[in-house]
């Protein structure tokens, strides 16, 4: 589970990551990464709009993404990072495994993890 100290909650932090950060897209997700000068743990936030689906689908998608992101925290820089994972409509029908592949692909494209084979 993503601990409270690693959750991105404030609008200003989302804005920094979305407007000023690097962006990498996949079929189901867009990842935004920004580094701030503040000494706080890397934090992760999620944007899952109504375009993804109804309330149940949106919350299920966000829970899946939160679980995937929690497992990837150790690969990210420890301090000062803001990662926003924005779900596209196709994320609503994706499995947890498919979302994990997309998160990994996005992190590779952002240069946050080592490049692997099959990155398209």
From Swiss-Prot:
Signal peptide: none annotated. The keyword Cell membrane does not apply. GO terms for cellular component: ribonuclease P complex. It catalyses: Endonucleolytic cleavage of RNA, removing 5'-extranucleotides from tRNA precursor. Keywords: Endonuclease, Hydrolase, Nuclease, RNA-binding, tRNA processing. Its EC number is 3.1.26.5. GO terms for biological process: tRNA 5'-leader removal. GO terms for molecular function: 3'-tRNA processing endoribonuclease activity; ribonuclease P activity; tRNA binding. It holds the Pfam family Ribonuclease_P. HAMAP family: RNase_P. Belongs to the RnpA family. RNaseP catalyzes the removal of the 5'-leader sequence from pre-tRNA to produce the mature 5'-terminus. It can also cleave other RNA substrates such as 4.5S RNA. The protein component plays an auxiliary but essential role in vivo by binding to the 5'-leader sequence and broadening the substrate specificity of the ribozyme. Consists of a catalytic RNA component (M1 or rnpB) and a protein subunit. This is Ribonuclease P protein component. It comes from Kineococcus radiotolerans (strain ATCC BAA-149 / DSM 14245 / SRS30216).
């Amino acid at each position: 589970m993503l601990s409270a100290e690693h959750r991105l909650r404030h609008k200003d932090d989302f804005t920094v990551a979305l407007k000023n950060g690097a962006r990498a897209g996949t079929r189901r997700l867009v990842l935004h990464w920004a580094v701030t000068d503040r000494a706080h743990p890397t934090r992760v936030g999620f944007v899952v709009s109504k375009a993804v689906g109804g309330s149940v689908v949106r919350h299920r998608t966000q829970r899946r993404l939160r679980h995937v992101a929690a497992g990837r925290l150790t690969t990210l820089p420890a301090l000062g990072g803001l990662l926003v994972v924005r779900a596209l409509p196709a994320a609503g029908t994706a499995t947890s495994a498919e979302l994990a592949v997309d998160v990994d692909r996005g992190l590779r494209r952002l240069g946050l993890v080592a490049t692997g084979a099959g990155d398209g």
